[in-house]
Amino acid sequence: MAKETFSIEFAGRTLTVETGQVAKQANGAVVVRYGDTTVLTAATMGKMATGDFFPLQVNYEEKMYAAGKFPGGFNKREARPSTDATLTARLIDRPIRPMFAEGFRNEVQVINTVLSYDENASGRVAAMFGSSLALAISDIPFDGPIAGVEVAYIDGKYIINPTVAEKEASSLELSVAGNINAINMVESGAKELSEEVMLGALLAGHNAVKELIEFQNEIVAKVGKEKAEVELLHVDEDLKAEVIAAYNSDLQKAVQVEEKLAREAATKAVKEAIISVYSAKYENDENLSIILRDLAEILEGMEHAEVRRLITEDKIRPDGRKIDEIRPLDAEIDFTPRSITHGTGLFTRGQTQALSTLTLAPMNEAQIIDGLNDEYKKRFMHHYNFPQYSVGETGRYGAPGRREIGHGALGERALEQVLPSLEEFPYAIRLVAEVLESNGSSSQASICAGTLALMAGGVPIKAPVAGIAMGLISDGTNYTVLTDIQGLEDHFGDMDFKVAGTREGITALQMDIKISGITPEILAEALAQAKTARFQILDVIEATIAQPREELAPSAPKIDTITIPVDKIKVVIGKGGEQIDKIIAETGVKIDIDDEGLCSIFSSDQSAIDRAKEIIAELVREAKVGEVYEAKVVRIESFGAFVNLFGKQDAMVHISEMAWARTAKVEDVMKLGDVVKVKIMKIDDKGRVDASMRALIEKPEGYVEPERKPRERRDNKDRRNGNGFDRRNNDRNNHNNNSGNHSFELRERKSHVDHEFPELSTKKPE
């Protein structure tokens, strides 16, 4: 295949696709260039069907060379995917997965490799576009294309694929994907936006998606391959009819048992009895394994059909609830002692239960993120754990998987919108959600538990946040939207639409579906139903704890902040860290200073924090014109005296500014070590300070300022050295730097006295 290039302008950038040049042994491969972001996507398919599920794997690989950076760590090589890469892979997987045929079992891999990275041209958007297109032009059976975009909301306007600056100004961060007809994936964080604004964003995003799909269709028409014939998993129709006729009523009764564990036991007993009958019947048949495989699919299909029939026809849910009814709710705080942990919340919804624990720490404990973007500190972390005991099973136990990372990130987006600013609350914040029981919607339970933990821990959040999961049963013509779906409804339903927010608006959305897409009407109904449910949950949370506690837990670290000028950071740190180490040694605190000058001081002892803050304030303090100080005399010269205002800040009091009457000698007015009251009169551009004592003394009645003789012009040699360098500036700097070399300063001040106050001059007339 020869190289082909296709380009369009999309959302203010050039989108270019290249095919036929690289990765030609893959079933399909494309290079997508969006702005200066370049992503190579390759799609491959296994030769044979495997297993009883569809093994789709989507990867998003961030290569550090793409941003001109070295990987961190000892080995200087990319290792496990970053959290962002994992979330991006999930983001691409979710809209692609529903686009494969029922019964398709061949393994499919879609690998996205970021070759160059432009922070203002989304790698996620490019990779999702490339994933769909690589599958669409390949011989892999794929009912696409799909595409996705990012949407921002600024000043009442929706912006497609925003830049970094636009994202920072936006009250919405939305990823939306779909096919030409409908939306099939949503992921969003928002600053308490209304349902109407969110729906508008989804529709604006889908309109942009349609443009990308039309572009893909043009490319497929020119370079697409003929789709391969693959064997789909089909059950024996005669066997299916036989089993349904004989056992459907038994399975229906089992499915209608309301309590989860009892229902699971009942359905398991019915299925095992049926399998036992057919195992004996076909014991000697060489196709026994295929028969049993088909039988498992048939029984799963029967259960699937009964759950959906109950909901759509009888309007009865498996646990007996109404379509829009929430399971029983319970909320509790302080599950563990406040003397040890910083805040806990236990939230229960039916048979789903989550325990969230808050930990506060200074900002130097924040997570450092070093990816393709510039390195930064992540202040808020929400981690989600799903142990197998929560569903009464044994299984894998270890590092979090993609699902746990994804659910943690969803909770993080939902809650971070209501957190106080770093200036208001100078802590790094970590929430860990332990799912203790699960029967659906555990991610939303973790959000509710997180709200309880934050409020119990004294974090001054703007408002409590609650989350609810909505479901959908659709036959293509009619549909039913379900509130608070349980595990069975999630498993056999068509949609899992999670909505989190406050009473003011939505803070997070996530939608996954198993059908090709859903309409705006369904989305609007689901959002409205979710709002009603969210308010019910907030009632329970607020009845448990109405406002965040005013005091932190006794076990929480004490932190205070002081903002210092950026140019003073080096003063606080000192040469080689000498100054900051001295403060730490004296007070026993720990100190963290960010690039913006926010200085966080933390300790278990509040008095130590106060002392450290006092020292730092003194170090960065600056004199201001008009301020009055009690200053100590630190040096006396014939023309005046130097006084210490505070710290290392000195000021010069000229002899003429010591009194209204003529002062013959400085020593007549003050001596070393005296404390005198002075007023700041002038600060020059080099930071040198002139002060006055007489400005604080009432002018004598009838006082007349002495007449000053005009200055005589002197040869430059009197004021400059042989290189033309002005010695006066250097002289004064020598004093300010405590160098001890004041010879130039003396000459400067002596010359000043001679010219300005000839009556005080000791110089002989020329």
Curated annotation (Swiss-Prot):
Top EC class of this enzyme: transferase
Cofactors required: Mg(2+)
SMART domains per UniProt: KH, S1
Domain S1 motif residues, every copy: 626-694
Basic and acidic residues composition-biased segments: 700-734, 744-766
Domain KH: 557-616
GO biological process, one term: mRNA catabolic process
Keyword Translocase included in the entry's annotation: no
Matches recorded under PROSITE patterns: KH_TYPE_1 (PS50084), S1 (PS50126)
One GO cellular component, as annotated: cytosol
Enzyme Commission designation: 2.7.7.8
InterPro entries, per database record: ExoRNase_PH_dom1 (IPR001247), ExoRNase_PH_dom2 (IPR015847), ExoRNase_PH_dom2_sf (IPR036345), KH_dom (IPR004087), KH_dom_type_1 (IPR004088), KH_dom_type_1_sf (IPR036612), NA-bd_OB-fold (IPR012340), PNPase (IPR012162)
Pfam families in alphabetical order: KH_1, PNPase, RNase_PH, RNase_PH_C, S1
Keywords linked to the UniProt accession: Cytoplasm, Magnesium, Metal-binding, Nucleotidyltransferase, RNA-binding, Transferase
Main location: cytoplasm
Cell compartment(s), UniProt: Cytoplasm
Residues annotated to bind Mg(2+): 490, 496
HAMAP family for this protein: PNPase (MF_01595)
The family this protein is said to belong to: Belongs to the polyribonucleotide nucleotidyltransferase family.
Job description of the protein: Involved in mRNA degradation. Catalyzes the phosphorolysis of single-stranded polyribonucleotides processively in the 3'- to 5'-direction.
This protein's name: Polyribonucleotide nucleotidyltransferase
Organism per entry: Lactococcus lactis subsp. cremoris (strain MG1363)
Taxonomic classification: Bacteria, Bacillati, Bacillota, Bacilli, Lactobacillales
Gene designation: pnp
